[in-house]
Amino acid sequence: TVISIYSAAMLVYCTVNNLFITETNNRYSDINDITQYMLGHETNPSQVKVYTSFNDGAYLEFYGFKCYLDARMEIMLKSINQQNDIFNEYGKMRYYGNYKDVFDKYDFNYFLIEKNIKDYEYIKYDSKYELKHENNKYALFVKANVSE
């Protein structure tokens, strides 16, 4: 009957909608956790430089942090920004693992690293960086207070 079809359709809609909302909340819970940690330790986010990857910068920028990279390609190419080819630099860093050059060049305050990339394993054991906060997806590092 029409009522049975309508009821079944509503059940499917509510189930799918609930799954979408749950997935969306889970997707942002890890980056939000890191952001809240940083907000709890920084009084002026606009003065804080954060190394971020392609997919994470926009979230932190929303809260006022200065981020290395986000998904806006128009500002990542030297032909447009007239300063650095950030997107190419990022690609080389991810492929070759030369994170130290990029990290030193920009003098970041924080390094937001996804735990599923190879750079995480390098940085985790690099004595020049100290882990400050982590969750399932991200690790947040700062420069360690070590003499060279």
Q: What positions do the PLM features span?
A:
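Generic structural signal of hydrophobic/aromatic residues within well-ordered alpha-helices
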Residues: 1, 12-15, 34, 86-90, ...
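Transmembrane alpha-helical segments
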Residues: 1-26
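Membrane-embedded, lumen/periplasm-facing catalytic core of multi-pass transferases
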Residues: 18-54
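Extracytoplasmic/secreted envelope proteins and their assembly/folding machinery
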Residues: 31-35, 57, 100, 120
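Short periplasmic/luminal acceptor-recognition loop of GT-C membrane glycosyltransferases, typified by
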Residues: 39-82, 108-116, 141
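Periplasmic/luminal catalytic loop of GT-C fold multi-pass membrane glycosyltransferases
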Residues: 81-140
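Short beta-strand-to-coil "C-cap" segments at the C-terminal boundary of structured domains/repeats
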Residues: 141-147
